[in-house]
Amino acid sequence: VGSDHTDRAAETHGIALSKQMCGKPVSPELWKLSEVEDHWDALEMRAHATIMGRRVLYQEGRLASLRPPADLMARRPGGPALPPGTVMFCGTLGALGGIRPGARFEMELHDPVRGRTLRHAYDIAELPVVS
């Protein structure tokens, strides 16, 4: 589980640019696609954000609402085969209450079939805009 966050102001100039500007925090644990592919739609994603000092539910839902990995890989410019060790972001759920900045982000991916959960969190330091 990881975060593909962006710089919202930079998004006005280009989504790819805004994504390249931000690091991608990723859980130190992972699951192989082969371990979850047969029940992908049942996986549950949840995120909390600390906004103005309050921890709030930010995103929640099943991966059934996202494109399956095989579909995304088939659309890949280099073809569907990914090099060993590749990590791929597969989309995101809508932000409950809309996108808003926060001081902390916590995320989890729960596998109800195998009874396990990946978790990760990070703090956000907003940099001042200087000219």
Model-predicted segments: where are they?
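Catalytic-core "active-site belt" of small-molecule-metabolizing enzymes
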Residues: 1-87, 94-131
